[in-house]
Each structure stands twice: as structure tokens, then as C-alpha cells.
Amino acid sequence: MYKRQQQRLLEKTHKKFIRSGANLPADKQARLREINKQLSTLGITFSNNILNENNDFKLYVGKEEDLAGLPQWFRESAMAEARATGQEGKWLFTLHNASRLPFLQYSANRPLREQMYKAYINRGNNNDKNDNKKIIADIVSLRLEKAQLLGFDCYSNFVLDNTMAKNSTAVMDFLNNLWSYALPKAKAEAAELQKLMDKEGKGEKLEAWDWWYYTEKLRKEKYNLEEEEIKPYFKLENVREGAFAVANKLYGITLTKLEGIPVYHPDVEVFEVKAADGSQVGIFYVDSVSYTHLRAHETIRHLVC
């Protein structure tokens, strides 16, 4: 008799094989492999196109009055970015998170905020070499074919079948219920931001590129709090030490920095992880730097040797 854990492992393993097409006849298995191959290629192309659009956009500002509202540290960073591209005396802003988000949050120049926002939201939708519309259509078509090969009416039900939700109907019921609470709250917040805009007497209507800027102003007005004031408490070193302290409190592990360990980039740090009894758990590589040639995201990978 299998133990409960063994039975669960067997069920999950069996389902994984079924979802990979093990029950399909040979010709359909071959087609499924081809679909998976195409989806992989299309997914990589899609991501690369977005990355290219991120890197291609450059907003140069040549007049200091157009920097109104931007913190000094951000101006200095933008000037250094422009200098690195040979544009001395200008300020460079890009679509990367570290540039785009502070710009939308602090820039008093509404036309430039709009330009920045629209450039970001329209990545892959500019009818150029990086356009993703055809790729999206191909992905949707292939996903549907894959789902139907495996006995599902749509791709979302194929994906959700392996989750707690089980199907798209359950997900939509949950989202619609959540929407009934979230929408009135969002409308109230928008009205509050619009009221703040109206005080300026410009007769402008709240748009997506205004949201961060007026939220920051509202925070200052209501709570006398500026995000800049709390930044020093969230330096990388402080956040990392805080995370390590939480790991120690929750799991009893300690992380000690190691020197002289081979790394794939000079910015990477290496830590030895030990359990509460002092036994070694593993080695933890921390890469905290954002790179322009990589998609902005956070991930943790494990390697067992």
C-alpha cells in the first residue's frame, strides 16, 4: 500500500506525462512536439522584441526647466547616462524601471510623461521590426491547437487544470467578484486625483500618465510623506540584511559572505548557507544589478549537483 505522499507523487507524475501528450497517437505527439518548439521560439522572439524596444527608446532633455519636479539624485543619474552616450550637457531617460518609474512619479512635465508612458505601453506595437502583433496571433493559435490536442476547449483551461482554480470559469467568477469591490475603490481614488489636478486650474483630465505623479503629490499633501525621505532606509545592503534576518528567524539559517569564489560577473556576491545546527545547506549567488541587455525581473534558481 502506497503511503499518502507516495500516492500523491505518483498522481502528479502520471498527470505530467498525460499533459505532455503521452496518451496521444504518434502523429499527434509529433505535432505536439512541433507546436511546443514553435511556441518556445515565438516566446523568445516576443521577449527579445520587448527588450529591443526598451533599449532603443531614449528621451533626451536639453532644457533644465523640463526637469521640474525631478529629485537631484535622479537628475545627476540622467546626466551621467547622457554623458555616457556622448550627449554632454543633456539628461537621458529610458524605459528601464530605474529611469521610467521615477520619471512618471516626479516629472512635472506632462507632455514628457505622456511620451514616456506611451513609449512603454506600446512596446512591440509600432509596426516595425520589433512588432509583436503577428507573434501574439501565432502564439494564441498554437496554444489553442495544443489545448485541443490534449482534450481541452481552450488554453486557459489546459493551464488551470493543474492548479487549485481548475478552470477559467472559477477564475472569472473570482475576478468578477473582486472587480465589484476594486472598481468603486479605483474610481474613488481617480476622483481624488482629479480633484488635485483641478486645483491647478489647467482644465486637464486625469490620464494614465498622470497617476504616479499625482499620487505622489497626494501622498505629500495628505500625509506629509515623500518617498524620497524613506529611500535611505531601503538601500540594497539594508534590504539584503533584512531578508537574511527574516530567513534566520523563520528557518534558522545563516548566510555568510564568501570571498574568492568564481562568479560570472564582478557584481555577483556569494554567500554560504548554513542550517541552525551549523551544517552546510548550500551556496547562494546574489546578482542584484539590473542589466540593459536582460529583461527586468526577479528570479531564484536552484542547482543540485
Residue ranges and their predicted role:
Residues 3-158, 242:
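Noncatalytic, helix-rich "gating/capping" subdomain that lines the substrate-entry/channel surface
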Residues 9-10, 41, 48, 53-94, ...:
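Active-site-proximal, well-structured secondary-structure segments within enzyme catalytic domains
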Residues 303-305:
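Hydrophobic alpha-helical segments, chiefly the membrane-spanning helices
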